[in-house]
Regions:
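Anionic group-binding determinants
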Residues: 1-163
């Protein structure tokens, strides 16, 4: 579904684009002219804050997983079912729901799981405890993005045992 751009609004900076749109400028420092966007910023920040609070993440961790929180919360926000048509926002825009949006199979942000990493001897650990922060893009629905608190890195894996 592609539509031709009719109008492009920006601050009075005068950037020169080759798209040949009809230009409309807004004044600087006037949030009343872009109220919907300002409200959306607050909504996204509130979602991210609520998700991190529910996962008991401190401020240092929140900064590290902020991008994951935003991607996950935006995707979840678009899965809201429309009251009148019983369709998700994805379906209303002519798109398919994400592969991971299967009822009953979705994981909770901040959920703990052990990512298996092979054997380390007979008595060694066979996995690393990590935290779920989202779903991997361009993979099967059961491929997860897991955050390792020890190394502070995000790993994609489908070998997860949920705690």
């Amino acid at each position: 579904m592609q539509e031709k751009m009719k109008k492009l609004m920006e601050r009075a900076a005068g950037a020169d684009w080759k798209l040949n749109p009809k230009w409309e400028f807004t004044a600087c420092s006037t949030p009343q002219q872009n109220g919907l966007v300002e409200v959306e910023f607050a909504t996204i920040a509130g979602r991210a804050r609520a998700m991190c609070n529910a996962a008991h993440m401190n401020d240092k961790i929140r900064i590290l997983v902020a991008n994951e929180v935003l991607m996950y919360s935006n995707a979840l926000g678009n899965l809201v079912v429309d009251k009148d048509q019983s369709q998700t926002h994805y379906q209303l825009m002519g798109l398919q729901n994400p592969k991971w949006a299967i009822p009953g199979a979705m994981r909770t942000f901040g959920e703990a799981g052990v990512v298996t990493c092979g054997k380390h001897g007979k008595l060694g650990d066979r996995g690393i405890p990590m935290v779920f922060v989202g779903y991997a893009e361009n993979h099967f629905h059961y491929c997860y993005r897991m955050w390792n608190p020890a190394s502070r890195q995000i790993t994609e894996s489908h070998d997860v045992i949920w705690i």
